[in-house]
Amino acid sequence: MAEASSLERQSPRVASCLVHSLCPREPSLQTTAVVSMGSADHQFNLAELLTQNYNLQEGCAEAPQCPDKPEEELDKDFIDQSSDMPLDELLALYGYESSDPISEQESEGGDTAPALPDMTLDKEQIAKDLLSGEEEEETQSSADDLTPSVTSHEASDLFHNQSGSRFLAGDNGPGSSASSDTEEDALPANKCKKEIMVGPQFQADLNILHLNRHCDKIYENEDQLLWSPSVLPEREVEEFLYRAVKRRWQEMAGPQIPEGEVVKDSEQALYELVKCNFNVEEALRRLRFNVKVIRDGLCAWSEEECRNFEHGFRVHGKNFHLIQANKVRTRSVGECVEYYYLWKKSERYDYFAQQTRLGRRKFVSSGTTDTEQDLDGLDPDGHARLHSEAGVPVEPLNVDIEAGGLDQPGVGSDDLPSSEPGPRPFQQLDEPPAVPSLQQPTSLAASAELPPAAAAAPEPGTSPRLPVDLALPEELPLVSSPVALSEDTAEPMAPAQVALSVTEFGLIGIGDVNPFLTGHPACPTSTLHSEPLSQCNVMTC
């Protein structure tokens, strides 16, 4: 019996409660219950504990005035009132053994800790106490007398949620712990402690696969030797790599590798050396014309390569295949394209463009101005086609007709030419000449109004011209067929002096020159002038 009482003190719990006359005016709230508070020797009236010093009767008296007051508010009032209870009454209310009033008087408010059970928050200790209590209850047949059941169900209606959680928490505790233990036992062992599966017993057996693929080839191509380090000494290999990477194809004199120089490996260059049967000079010769093998990023271009590229660009334009094939053999086409876009953003390109524009101005005539053109649009024949397309503006043939005295040999009365040169009086002909009247175009008429000196003077801004004065025979027409001629002649006209201003003699065909030279008597005398060649007049008979 003493062991049972000590068990009750270690695991206190409320088995039943007694609520009596909490509200005497409310019959539905009247309940009778017996409460066992941790010890069978002490029984307390729950109604006396609640009504002492807290005026519960006043709250029950107000209940008829508020018949619709919910149970939640009643529970809230009960919680508020229980929060102000002294410690002894609160311990007695929740099933702990209350201290004796006589011992309290003797101790005069002394320490109550020795009378209290050992309270702890350690879950393992609580579970151990609960399990030990359950084992003792199974062995003892009188355990049911220590925990009497609740005889009235109306108390649960009074304490809707609070009573179930507080007064019956002890009853649900062992059951819940037991159920949790069963759940833990049901879990697999690997979930708590996972085993690392390492070892031959956990490996897959691949012997069958190896037997099946023993006769199959992994790949069809034959193996190739890429490099063999045991053929050449390490020093010679480093010298080869230095010459290959630095583009030094000739044999070096003196110390082969500069002191402190770091030589990087090049698998492509070493493979080329293997293909040449470790002949260094032959491998370097191949690398010189096969730059793709030793290409490691965009290597720095030498000054000679830059000049060759610029010359090739000036000749071939953007045809990088021709530039690489004819000018820059040490670089690939892709490197030429990449260098071109980097070159356009550099100062070297600006200087190249300036020199190219200056060279083009030398071939352009003085009267025209060179327009700013992008060098990207140039082609190899850009300079030659520039002059043929632009050309020099061709002016129409200027024909100046002067009637009156002409500087030609005179004709006598006997129809023989006179030997005396000089102006002769104009003789009226009986019949009009065979030469029709010439209708001058607007440009010719404008030039005819000017004096001969002004008409023969060269225009500013044009190339110097060579005026030629020709005396035509009577039978020869003055102009060619493209000029419109009027059939009606208003008055007869005599042969006139013709001044031909020719800019380019290529416009005059050989057929147009022969009639001037054939079938005409030779000129007896020729007049020489001291004027410059550009202003001299050549007189012909």
Curated annotation (Swiss-Prot):
Species assigned in the record: Mus musculus (Mouse)
Function: Transcriptional repressor.
Alphabetical list of InterPro entries matching this protein: ELM2_dom, Homeodomain-like_sf, MIER/MTA, SANT/Myb, SANT_dom
Stretches the record annotates as Disordered: 100-119, 131-186, 364-440
Positions carrying Phosphoserine: S11
Cellular component GO terms, alphabetical: cytoplasm; nucleus; protein-containing complex
Name of protein: Mesoderm induction early response protein 2
Chain segments annotated as coiled-coil in the UniProt record: none
Domain SANT residue range list: 296-348
Cellular compartments annotated: Nucleus
Gene label: Mier2
